[in-house]
Amino acid sequence: MRKSVIAIIIIVLVVLYMSVFVVKEGERGITLRFGKVLRDDDNKPLVYEPGLHFKIPFIETVKMLDARIQTMDNQADRFVTKEKKDLIVDSYIKWRISDFSRYYLATGGGDISQAEVLLKRKFSDRLRSEIGRLDVKDIVTDSRGRLTLEVRDALNSGSAGTEDEVTTPAADNAIAEAAERVTAETKGKVPVINPNSMAALGIEVVDVRIKQINLPTEVSEAIYNRMRAEREAVARRHRSQGQEEAEKLRATADYEVTRTLAEAERQGRIMRGEGDAEAAKLFADAFSKDPDFYAFIRSLRAYENSFSGNQDVMVMSPDSDFFRYMKTPTSATR
């Protein structure tokens, strides 16, 4: 008897344990009975908020959905700007489940991979459209914040964008099919949502960010070569200007040297002329005071200059006036 009571107590405890489930903070729970979702009066799946809840053991199971903000990294992709220039854009998306019932039905049981595939394709389509309306300068500077904001709003609202928007019908069709599935599951009791928006999947895009923007390899090399050519042209221009300035300085220096030498030569000639004139004046004054003595001195200097040379032979007439002071010393008095 005692063993039976213990067994019953154990069974009751196990049943109670299996009848209780806890939805953690940051999660939501959806109950399935025999594999089918429990629904409310509007035929929408029942969603359990965080807390302690009960279920029928062995009959009902609970599917947990993550209510936290999810981050989805996008592979760097090539986009074309308004200027028909290619850019490699690396980005990520932050999203969360805004309508758990719709999300569960639209994704075929809360399949996060299916939701992210649709979100990624729609995001790529929307980002391609926005980048196609901007030039490179707007994308990499002031317009980046506005660009991501417009992409986020377009994803949430389902905006069709401008006439030149590049669309991916497959993604939109998949979202539209998911929205139709939700309508069919709920028998039209849920509000109709724009099938082009992510709200049709029960998803809200919280944030869109561009991590980095790069140029394709071939474009980067072309820009590098152009920049190098421009720098080399600037260097050549500076070298040419330097050589021109050097030539100017050398020409100026040569001119100054020539001018200084010419001026010195002119001053020297003037001074020599003045000296010669002064010497001539002195000679003239001396000659006027004693012409005979002056003539005698001049003759002595002539003798000295004549006999100091290397030649030891002089051919002259004996009657030459050159020897008058040698013949007759008194000739100085004539």
From Swiss-Prot:
SUPFAM superfamilies with a match to the protein in the record: Band 7/SPFH domain
Q: Which GO terms describe its cellular component?
A: membrane protein complex; plasma membrane protein complex
Highest taxon, organism lineage = Bacteria
- Residue ranges spanning the membrane: these are 3-23
Periplasmic-side segments: 24-334
Record's Pfam families?
Answer: Band_7
Localization per record: Cell inner membrane
Q: What does this protein do?
A: HflC and HflK help govern the stability of phage lambda cII protein, and thereby control the lysogenization frequency of phage lambda. HflKC inhibits the SecY-degrading activity of FtsH, possibly helping quality control of integral membrane proteins.
| Record's miscellaneous remark | Integration of this protein into the membrane depends on SecA, SecY and SecD but not on SecB or FtsY. HflC is unstable in the absence of HflK.
Quaternary structure per UniProt?
HflC and HflK interact to form a complex, originally called HflA, now called HflKC. HflKC interacts with FtsH; complex formation is stimulated by ATP, and with YccA.
Question: Which protein, by its recorded name, is this?
Answer: Modulator of FtsH protease HflC
- Show the taxonomic lineage: Bacteria, Pseudomonadati, Pseudomonadota, Gammaproteobacteria, Enterobacterales
